[in-house]
């Protein structure tokens, strides 16, 4: 198992319960879609995995190591292997597409070299290769804010791939996109992650897209897992119960 979550709980300082208790395991190479209503705890769960949200209790084992116990250098090392794709892209808009993808390599560089943008030639070649795979090679030198929303999200995927991660977390990556752009983004994400053997966990509101692209689906409601199975096993009744 590349990821194992045991007794994960999150209570915010104001008393809001983000996660009641989650236990699950994820195999290497799987594409998992996490579905559920707004406020169910999907984003809290996803962001707990790389400690963007600090769990209240529980354990999260990434490739056998508990990231909840990691501090300082060890935490940075573990985060290098966990790529993140954000709902609102999180790109540096005034920088080029290529520079944004190269930022996926910053975790492997010294602070000085990273700050000066002194990337190794092999990093640049790798970034251009990834851009080609997401259909954006010809946009490499454009500013990120000159691209459409769907294209910007593909840059976000390319940046995550450039980290050479073993795990990618994608938090509502198509929430702001039209259906065609959404399908393109999920297609590129699934294809490249399959080719590279990267495990992917994606939060989605759109159940039909989740069923089309996921190997396995996890339904979260009120901070707990209420469904865990294949897309074929997810019935209309289960969806209705999940979103009631």
From Swiss-Prot:
Its main location: membrane. Its EC number is 7.3.2.2. ATP binds at residues 36-43. Residues 3-242 form the ABC transporter domain. The keyword Transport applies. It is a peripheral membrane protein. It is an enzyme of class 7 (translocase). CDD domains: ABC_PhnC_transporter. PROSITE patterns: ABC_TRANSPORTER_1, ABC_TRANSPORTER_2, PHNC. One of its GO terms (cellular component) is plasma membrane. Keywords: ATP-binding, Cell membrane, Membrane, Nucleotide-binding, Phosphonate transport, Translocase, Transport. It comes from the Bacteria. GO terms for molecular function: ABC-type phosphonate transporter activity; ATP binding; ATP hydrolysis activity. Belongs to the ABC transporter superfamily. Phosphonates importer (TC 3.A.1.9.1) family. The complex is composed of two ATP-binding proteins (PhnC), two transmembrane proteins (PhnE) and a solute-binding protein (PhnD). This is Phosphonates import ATP-binding protein PhnC 2. It comes from Halalkalibacterium halodurans (strain ATCC BAA-125 / DSM 18197 / FERM 7344 / JCM 9153 / C-125) (Bacillus halodurans).
